[in-house]
Amino acid sequence: MSIDSLPPLREVIERHDLMPKKSLGQNFLFDLNLTSKIARQAGDLRDQPVIEVGPGPGGLTRALLAQGAYVTAIERDDRCLEALAEIAAHYPGRLRIIAGDALEQDFTALFPEGPKPRIVANLPYNVGTQLLLNWLLVEPWPPFYSSMTLMFQREVAERIVAKPDSDHYGRLGVLAGWRTQAKIAFDVPPQAFTPPPKVMSSVVHIVPRETPLPCRAEALGQITQAAFGQRRKMLRQSLKSIGGAALLEKMGIDGTRRAETLSVEEFVALANACLP
């Protein structure tokens, strides 16, 4: 059934009293041209499984279904479930709704067989970074998903794609650069949302590397957390709790350098040396 046969989103929100909750990091998208653009960025979705986190009233959900996807939508706001159920009725067998917190979801169990899902979502701003970290550090690798097309605040998007010696380079950039190839696809202005956030947003497209540099995810997660937790300090100080100066000397890395100057490859080498 056509997306045009569904009632307008503003009507759905009014009927179900779905004003966005700041406590849940909700900013709803009404522009169907924009939601369709996000869905297209994920590639050809015909008969492909898609995971959507935080669908809210279902603006992006509609676009994904209209492009032929099989959508699994995870929503913790019970107020939105009835509106999503109405969409499911228009697309029989194509929308699975899971009521719950995405941070507690076992994503690997959602698709035990068949093609890997794509993750496509306008992520709630208050949990978006943590969800991405979880998906970057998931084991085993290659991961349970084939790609991610995600909306973030522009500042977070810049951290994901940042390179060494740049203002935005940090733990997120190291982990994303290690295991994936990420790019900012396009920006979304505040006025596209209800309520409009105070900052620009960006859609990021992320594709997993089949064979990233060998390293334990837990080890790299720990060493980047230590290094960037005190990013203005020299490495011999910020890494003091895990060997500091001796470890850096062993690896031939100048202990007076700061975390933002190290390449992904250097972080991987440090992680392999200190946390085998």
Swiss-Prot record:
Keyword Calcium attributed: no
Keywords carried by this UniProt record: Cytoplasm, Methyltransferase, RNA-binding, rRNA processing, S-adenosyl-L-methionine, Transferase
Family assignment from sequence similarity: Belongs to the class I-like SAM-binding methyltransferase superfamily. rRNA adenine N(6)-methyltransferase family. RsmA subfamily.
GO molecular function, one term: 16S rRNA (adenine(1518)-N(6)/adenine(1519)-N(6))-dimethyltransferase activity
Binding-site residues for S-adenosyl-L-methionine, renumbered to this chain: 27, 29, 54, 75, 101, 122
Coiled-coil residue spans: none
Entry's localization field: Cytoplasm
EC identifiers of the protein: 2.1.1.182
Protein known as: Ribosomal RNA small subunit methyltransferase A
Function (record text): Specifically dimethylates two adjacent adenosines (A1518 and A1519) in the loop of a conserved hairpin near the 3'-end of 16S rRNA in the 30S particle. May play a critical role in biogenesis of 30S subunits.
Reaction(s) the record says it catalyses: adenosine(1518)/adenosine(1519) in 16S rRNA + 4 S-adenosyl-L-methionine = N(6)-dimethyladenosine(1518)/N(6)-dimethyladenosine(1519) in 16S rRNA + 4 S-adenosyl-L-homocysteine + 4 H(+)
EC class (word): transferase
GO terms under cellular component: cytosol
One Pfam family of this chain: RrnaAD
PANTHER family found in the cross-reference section: DIMETHYLADENOSINE TRANSFERASE, DIMETHYLADENOSINE TRANSFERASE-RELATED
